[in-house]
């Protein structure tokens, strides 16, 4: 992290009551209660200036729906940044289906910083002038459309918070998961030893850590190749795995 202050997420939304929501329980909730990170949900409508507290208007050029106004949202962003130090250090994100896909690599970057300001869109979108004028980075969590950016913001914050120092019980946990090395995570097993006639793979109970690591790597490669060929194509060829990398492995669980 770049500052001594706790990692802080500021969310601009028309529905601040949606926060902390699921971030108030489990790992994120305990970390929030203990001060390992901070959350501020700010109502965009508080920056409206007319008596009706209007935040949207019809699209220029016509079309369905409504558009979030640039003047209202810009005022909300500016108010949120007051007293937050240098705004250049703090990412400004807009949750949007047209944004760049959120990756684990980007999550790691965000978790190492001071924490982002996140704008949650609604309606047909927001005025492009505030996106450009306030330097908003558009981020997508998938190729689908939600009713607003709040659920996407919750997902992004959760992904970041679990990587913060002291949040997870075992520091290695965050580095041995799907996407941490570009691969999907290997299959996991625990007791009972035998479940419905299916045993835990013998190698996992062998006590040979090198063989266990090799098995997990091979399973991760097989899963990635079968389920996410887009990720598999980006995995660099490495000497210990060269044979498997030259020929796409087939995972028994994927047929």
UniProtKB/Swiss-Prot annotation:
Keywords in alphabetical order: Cytoplasm, Methyltransferase, S-adenosyl-L-methionine, Transferase, tRNA processing
Residues where S-adenosyl-L-methionine binds: 121, 141-146
A Gene Ontology cellular-component term: cytosol
Reactions this protein catalyses: guanosine(37) in tRNA + S-adenosyl-L-methionine = N(1)-methylguanosine(37) in tRNA + S-adenosyl-L-homocysteine + H(+)
GO BP term, example: tRNA N1-guanine methylation
EC identifiers of the protein: 2.1.1.228
Recorded GO MF terms: tRNA (guanine(37)-N1)-methyltransferase activity
Signal peptide range: none
Annotated region (Disordered), positions in chain: 236-255
InterPro entries: Alpha/beta_knot_MTases, tRNA_m1G_MeTrfase_C_sf, tRNA_m1G_MeTrfase_TrmD, tRNA_m1G_MTases_N, tRNA_MeTrfase_TRMD/TRM10
Biased composition (Basic residues): 244-255
Localisation per UniProt entry: Cytoplasm
UniProt enzyme class: transferase
Predominant location category: cytoplasm
HAMAP family: TrmD
Role, per record: Specifically methylates guanosine-37 in various tRNAs.
Family, similarity comment: Belongs to the RNA methyltransferase TrmD family.
UniProt subunit comment: Homodimer.
Protein name: tRNA (guanine-N(1)-)-methyltransferase
């Amino acid at each position: 992290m770049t500052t001594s202050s706790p990692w802080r997420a500021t969310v601009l939304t028309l529905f601040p009551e949606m926060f902390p929501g699921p971030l108030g329980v489990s790992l994120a909730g305990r970390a929030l209660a203990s001060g390992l990170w901070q959350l501020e949900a700010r109502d965009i409508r508080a920056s409206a200036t007319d008596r009706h507290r209007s935040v949207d208007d019809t699209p220029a050029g016509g079309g369905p729906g409504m558009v979030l106004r640039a003047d209202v949202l810009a005022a909300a962003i500016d108010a949120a940044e007051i007293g937050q130090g240098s705004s250049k250090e703090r990412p400004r994100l807009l949750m949007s289906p047209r944004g760049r896909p959120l990756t684990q690599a980007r999550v790691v970057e965000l978790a190492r910083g001071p924490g982002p300001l996140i704008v949650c869109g609604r309606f047909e979108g927001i005025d492009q002038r505030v996106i450009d004028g306030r330097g908003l980075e558009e981020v997508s969590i998938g190729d689908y459309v939600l009713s607003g950016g709040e659920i996407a913001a919750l997902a992004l914050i959760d992904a970041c918070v679990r990587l913060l120092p002291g949040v997870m019980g075992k520091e290695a946990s965050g580095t041995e998961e799907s996407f941490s090395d570009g691969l999907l995570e290997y299959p996991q097993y625990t007791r009972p030893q035998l479940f419905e006639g299916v045993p835990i793979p013998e190698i996992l109970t062998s006590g040979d850590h090198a063989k266990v690591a090799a098995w997990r790597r091979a399973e991760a490669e097989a899963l990635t190749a079968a389920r996410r060929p887009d990720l598999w194509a980006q995995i660099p060829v490495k000497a210990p795995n060269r044979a498997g990398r030259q020929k796409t492995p087939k995972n028994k669980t994927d047929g």
